[in-house]
Amino acid sequence: MAWKQTPLLLLVYMVTTGSGRDRTDLLNVCMDAKHHKTKPGPEDKLHDQCSPWKKNACCSVNTSQELHKADSRLYFNWDHCGKMEPACKSHFIQDSCLYECSPNLGPWIQQVDQSWRKERFLDVPLCKEDCHQWWEACRTSFTCKRDWHKGWDWSSGINKCPNTAPCHTFEYYFPTPASLCEGLWSHSYKVSNYSRGSGRCIQMWFDSTQGNPNEDVVKFYASFMTSGTVPHAAVLLVPSLAPVLSLWLPG
């Protein structure tokens, strides 16, 4: 039963704490960040791994091209500890496409005070397969930091390892899948116990010919934030939460 508590605890957290943005603005929205468009819309020529979002995207064609480059001065240098293995890099590119292009992250957007963005996402429930496969693909590649959000040497215009940060394998810095997915970007993601196709977790990878599965996921979580309630069925799954949930549920 413990695995079933994760989405419910997340829902309770979201209902009680709210979000960093207006509760009426949770669906089909873009973050206020460096490369994001102000509103999502079609981008027919999105590059390669970002193409699944072409029907409705928060990223531009140029951003989608730049984030695929190893030496982009617009984006991030993946090869800061030697050349990253292609299988590993593909997961980082997919992560970047989700971050830049997805209009389905509204419930997890938080306000921040940073020079390059005013908003970020926090604790997005990432499908467990996406996290595990990311870690498996990268465990033998090299990096020098556990938190990639801060602490880089940007003096050359691209991110380089500081002198105090030696290069080791990903598995050295991230011994478990969760330590990678949750720690890498300062808890942007929270590894879900749910699988792809469940409608309860965000997918990095999906077949766009079958539609975007994250649209249903964001609607599910947004519905609780806008209504401020949790269904009676949830109480049956987690009896220990009943005293708390009963405060919100109608009689």
Curated annotation (Swiss-Prot):
| Protein's membrane topology | Lipid-anchor; GPI-anchor
Q: Which GO molecular function annotations are given, in alphabetical order? A: folic acid binding; folic acid receptor activity
Q: Where is the lipid attached (GPI-anchor amidated serine)?
A: S227
Swiss-Prot/TrEMBL keywords: Cell membrane, Disulfide bond, Folate-binding, Glycoprotein, GPI-anchor, Lipoprotein, Membrane, Receptor, Signal, Transport
Query: Highest taxon of the source?
Result: Eukaryota
Loss of function: phenotype: No visible phenotype.
Q: Name one GO biological process term.
A: positive regulation of cell population proliferation
Q: Where in the cell is it found?
A: Cell membrane
Q: Where does folate bind?
A: D95, Y99, W116, R117, K118, E119, R120, H149, K150, G151, W152, D153, W154, S188
Which stretches are tagged as propeptide in the UniProt entry? 228-251
- Indicate the principal place this protein occupies in or around the cell: membrane
GO cellular component terms listed in the entry, alphabetical order:
external side of plasma membrane
* Name of one Pfam family that matches: Folate_rec
Q: Which InterPro entries would you find in this protein's record?
A: Folate_rcpt, Folate_rcpt-like
Disulphide bond pairs: C30-C58, C50-C97, C59-C101, C81-C167, C88-C138, C127-C201, C131-C181, C144-C161
Segment forming the signal sequence: 1-20
Q: Which residues are glycosylated?
A: N62, N193
The record's function comment reads: Binds to folate and reduced folic acid derivatives and mediates delivery of 5-methyltetrahydrofolate and folate analogs into the interior of cells. Has high affinity for folate and folic acid analogs at neutral pH. Exposure to slightly acidic pH after receptor endocytosis triggers a conformation change that strongly reduces its affinity for folates and mediates their release.
| Family that this chain belongs to | Belongs to the folate receptor family.
Q: What PANTHER family has UniProt attached to this entry?
A: FOLATE RECEPTOR (PTHR10517), FOLATE RECEPTOR BETA (PTHR10517:SF8)
Please state what the protein is called.
Answer: Folate receptor beta
Supply the source organism for this entry: Mus musculus
Q: What are the leading ranks of the lineage? A: Eukaryota, Metazoa, Chordata, Craniata, Vertebrata
